[in-house]
Amino acid sequence: MYKRQSLNYPEDSAGRLMSVDFVSLTPNMNVGEAIDSFRISDDLPIEFYEIYLVNDSSKPIAAISLSNIIRSSRDKSLKDLESHELIMISADMDRELVAYQFERFDLVSAPVVDDKGSLIGVITADDIVEVFKDEAGEDIKLLGGVGDEDITDSVIETSSN
């Protein structure tokens, strides 16, 4: 149900941005079973916005908002709950492209999948804010003519680059 694993991905990739603390359930559960499993779990993430329904191969098939689960009757099947379009992020996708996907589709969170399409993590809008901050900082440095040089570089080192 809950997955934790240590992953190493390139610095500018979605894999580096993602959290490996997420909630995934099977579509054959009902709302009551899902809520009961949350209550007894010692492994539940502190914050989460969506529950991912996965097939037997751990491939995401739907995302259901936590608010949708809370508003539904206990006997309603998870697969019958309304879910939004599932936008999946590849673990090796560049973080700037991930930020673009969040902006384009107005995402709160998105599942991250490996090269086999299996769910391995989640990226939230909070993570993307950091990407935008970093990109804005880079843009400001470029506008100021600083480029990739370290601020601690001497004037001679900077001008020779």
Feature-to-residue mapping (PLM):
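Cytosolic regulatory modules rich in charged/polar residues
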Residues: 3-161
